[in-house]
UniProtKB/Swiss-Prot annotation:
Name of the protein: Zinc finger CCHC-type and RNA-binding motif-containing protein 1
Phylogenetic placement of the source organism: Eukaryota, Metazoa, Chordata, Craniata, Vertebrata
Alphabetically ordered keywords of this record: Metal-binding, mRNA processing, mRNA splicing, Nucleus, Phosphoprotein, RNA-binding, Spliceosome, Zinc, Zinc-finger
GO cellular component: nucleoplasm; U12-type spliceosomal complex
PANTHER family xref list: ZINC FINGER CCHC-TYPE AND RNA-BINDING MOTIF-CONTAINING PROTEIN 1
Source organism (scientific name): Mus musculus
Assembly and binders: Component of the U11/U12 snRNPs that are part of the U12-type spliceosome. Interacts with ZRSR1.
Subcellular locations according to the entry: Nucleus, Nucleoplasm
Tissue specificity statement from the Swiss-Prot or TrEMBL entry: Expressed at higher level in heart and testis, and at lower level in cerebellum. Weakly expressed at low level in liver.
Leader peptide range in chain numbering: none
Phosphoserine: residues carrying this PTM: 155, 210, 216
A GO term for molecular function: RNA binding
Length: 217
């Protein structure tokens, strides 16, 4: 079975129904043949009374075919029922559209207040259990942080610490860089000196803060 409803193949046209049967009655009668999605009874525009004709939309075409074979030319409440696969008149999309009944104070079957159609006294087969409401999934909100996000610390490899805002701090920082640079060129204690070590220039510590470095011969 392909995904989605196919009303042109899964809708049963039923005629010669008893006029007293309600939507809920037909739902209970035809549910034995498969999953019923929608029941539509044709009614008179003025009197709102049933014309004895209904469309039963099943979830799949196999259920609709089983229904027509089982109920066609069979008696129901003393009447011979006619059932067949409905002919698509081009309004299939409109037919399967779900209707929302916003006024929950009155029964849409009889128009009286105090009950809904599921428990309408005119249901010949008694009350029907209403469908369960689908629970809406609530979006989980991210918890608000109790403290402000800490600033990311800048490592020495990424650049100078921006906190060096005074001259004394800048001098100390520059001096540490010079000493670190000298330690890289300093030979291991007790090890023989190489010709490369003697050729490398020695950096002379500057007495003041400067971008230039003094080299000694």
């Amino acid at each position: 079975m392909s995904g989605g409803l196919a009303p042109s193949k899964s809708t049963v046209y039923v005629s010669n129904l008893p006029f007293s049967l309600t939507n809920n009655d037909l739902y209970r009668i035809f549910s034995k043949y498969g999953k019923v999605v929608k029941v539509t009874i044709m009614k008179d525009k003025d009197t709102r009374k049933s014309k004895g004709v209904a469309f039963i939309l099943f979830l799949d075409k196999d259920s609709a075919l089983n229904c027509t074979r089982a109920i066609n030319n069979k008696q129901l409440f003393g009447r011979v029922i006619k059932a067949s696969i409905a002919i698509d008149n081009g309004r299939a999309a409109e037919f399967i559209r779900r209707r929302n009944y916003f006024d929950k104070s009155k029964c849409y079957e009889c128009g009286e207040s105090g009950h809904l159609s599921y428990a309408c006294p005119k249901n010949m087969l008694g009350e029907r259990e209403p469908p369960k409401k689908k629970e809406k999934k609530k979006k989980r909100k991210l918890p608000e942080p109790e403290e402000e996000i800490e600033e990311v610390e800048v490592s020495e490899e990424e650049g100078e610490d921006p906190a060096l805002d005074s001259l004394s701090q800048a001098i100390a920082f520059q001096q540490a860089k010079i000493e670190e640079e000298q330690s890289k060129w300093r030979p291991n204690p007790g090890g023989p000196s190489t010709s490369d070590d003697s050729r490398r220039p020695r950096i002379k510590k500057s007495a003041y803060f400067s971008d230039e470095e003094e080299l000694s011969d």
